[in-house]
Curated annotation (Swiss-Prot):
Family annotation (InterPro entries): BTP, Histone-fold, TAF8, TFIID_su8_C
Subcellular location: Nucleus
GO CC annotations, alphabetized: transcription factor TFIID complex
Species the sequence originates in: Arabidopsis thaliana (Mouse-ear cress)
Protein's gene: TAF8
UniProt record similarity statement: Belongs to the TAF8 family.
Name the record gives this protein: Transcription initiation factor TFIID subunit 8
Assembly mode: Component of the TFIID complex. TFIID is composed of TATA binding protein (TBP) and a number of TBP-associated factors (TAFs) whose MWs range from 14-217 kDa. Can homodimerize. Interacts with TAF4B, TAF5, TAF10, TAF12, TAF12B, TAF13 and TAF14.
Length: 353
């Protein structure tokens, strides 16, 4: 279990350091071949894949750390690439970290490096055994058949879109592959035609609004009289007044033409009216003394012959008629009271009646 975790960790570290999956696969395969060859030279005849994977991971980590240390030494000396001396210093630095003695601090000669002497002794004593299959150089070159080279501007015979682009660079692909093109035909803008169309739409909307207003006005006027129509209201008021006068005069004639009736029977309606009047005398006096609210009639802007504030005027359309009727009732009560008092004060006239 621990070996598998170490193996996965080694793979992740190697992949992150290389920065490319292809480079990691190539280095991992080369490390497996080298570790297998070393194990075979020592005396191992066969081995399992998990053990080989773990040893390959250790070898890759060691080489990776060696390269990082050598690069840091090169950067300290102001160089961007490391050489053999940087690698020797890195080997001794890794030896010091493991607790062994590398290059002595007293003598800075690289020839006295312990690791370097060990490597020299190993190369001189062992025989080189090549791999069963030669390793290709990295990065692996792609064959000319599988490689698709983009032709340059000169090969195609086109001129670059800008003067700053040289002719030997690869030519650009077709414009439709990298430019955004609309899927529809773009309409040519016509300012004059757009204005005419807007004006036509505006007139159409106004006509629709006018027809709707006419329908509303006709519907309301057919149901109830409109307060803005003052002539109609005045005519209704005159009709109500004439009707009330005819009713009051008819009652007087009918009361005078009665023969053989007693005083109580003749003046019973008047007495009842007087009783009602006496009970609401305070209310009547308050009505008489109440200040009159004068409404100033003014001309308003009308739309299609009707006022704009139609709803407000419809609320008070019944007020003048009810006010006239209340005044007529008060007049009738006062007349009945006056006739009753005259009859009580002059009994001679009462006998004549």
């Amino acid at each position: 279990m621990n070996t598998e975790r170490a193996q996965e960790g080694d793979r992740n570290d190697a992949a992150s350091s290389s920065g490319c999956s292809e480079s990691y696969e190539f280095s991992h395969a080369a490390a497996k071949a080298a570790v297998a060859q070393v194990c075979e030279s020592v005396g191992y005849e066969n081995f399992k894949d998990p053990a080989l994977e773990s040893l390959s991971g250790f070898a890759l980590q060691y080489i990776l750390q060696l390269g990082k240390t050598a690069t840091s030494f090169a950067n300290l000396t102001g160089r961007s690439q490391c050489n053999v001396f940087d690698i020797i210093l890195a080997l001794d630095d890794l030896t010091d970290n493991n607790g062994e003695q590398g290059i002595s601090s007293e003598s800075c000669s690289l020839g006295r490096s312990i690791k370097l002497r060990e490597i020299i002794d190993f190369v001189n004593s062992s025989e080189e055994v090549p791999f069963s299959q030669p390793l290709p150089s990295f990065p692996v070159a792609i064959s000319d058949r599988s490689r698709k080279m983009i032709p340059s501007f000169v090969e195609i015979g086109e001129t670059p879109p800008g003067k700053h682009i040289p002719l030997w660079l690869p030519a650009f692909p077709d414009p439709h592959t990298y430019k955004e093109t609309p899927m529809w035909i773009e309409r040519v803008s016509d300012p004059r035609g757009d204005k005419i169309e807007q004006a036509r739409q505006r007139r159409k909307a106004e006509r629709a609004l006018l027809s709707l207003q006419r329908k509303l006005v006709c519907k309301i006027s057919s149901r109830n009289p409109v307060w803005g129509d003052m002539d109609g209201v005045k005519e209704e008021m005159r009709d109500d007044e004439s009707e009330l006068r005819s009713v009051s005069s008819g009652e007087k004639v009918e009361s005078l033409n009665r023969d053989g009736l007693s005083v109580i029977e003749a003046f019973a309606p008047a007495m009842e009216a007087a009783r009602d009047g006496f009970s609401s005398e305070a209310h009547t006096e308050w009505k008489k003394n109440k200040p009159v609210a004068l409404s100033k009639l003014r001309t308003e802007k009308k739309f299609l012959g009707q006022p704009l504030d139609l709803s407000l005027q419809m609320k008070g359309e019944d007020r003048p008629i009810s006010f006239v009727r209340e005044e007529d009732r008060d007049d009738k009560r006062r007349r009945a009271e006056f006739i009753l008092r005259q009859c009580m004060e002059n009994p001679v006239d009462l006998n004549q009646l």
